[in-house]
Design a protein with these regions (language model features):
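Short alpha-helix capping/helix-loop boundary micro-motifs
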Residues: 37-41
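A generic local secondary-structure boundary/capping motif
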Residues: 14-16, 42-44, 64-67
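C-terminal structural segments of small proteins and small subunits
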Residues: 54-87
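N-terminal first-folded block
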Residues: 1-32
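A structural micro-motif recognizing beta-strand termini
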Residues: 30, 42-44, 58, 80
Length: 87
């Protein structure tokens, strides 16, 4: 799991049927965690731009979304209210 900040969103008008109704957000990992690539993650918790989030990846992302058959690589599974050394 990684910690990141929501920096934008992606609109997809055509997608797999089991992804319809999901919101896609762009997440930037926290620089202090040494991860420098932005990712697109399915948002199941209603995160907003600027919020710090928890992102599950791989099969954990699919299970976290409640759809183990969906073609999902990353999912926002939590919003961080507070934490130490996050920025």
């Amino acid at each position: 799991m990684l910690i990141g900040k929501v920096v934008g969103y992606v609109v997809s008008t055509r997608k797999c049927d089991n992804l319809v109704g999901n919101k896609f957000m762009i997440v930037e990992p926290i620089p202090s965690l040494k991860i420098d690539n932005r990712i697109v993650a399915v948002d199941k918790v209603g995160a907003g731009i600027g919020e710090m989030v928890l992102v599950a990846q791989g099969s954990s992302a699919r299970i976290g979304c409640g759809n183990p058959q969906a073609p999902i690589d990353a999912a926002i599974v939590g919003i961080i209210d507070e934490g130490q050394n996050l920025e």
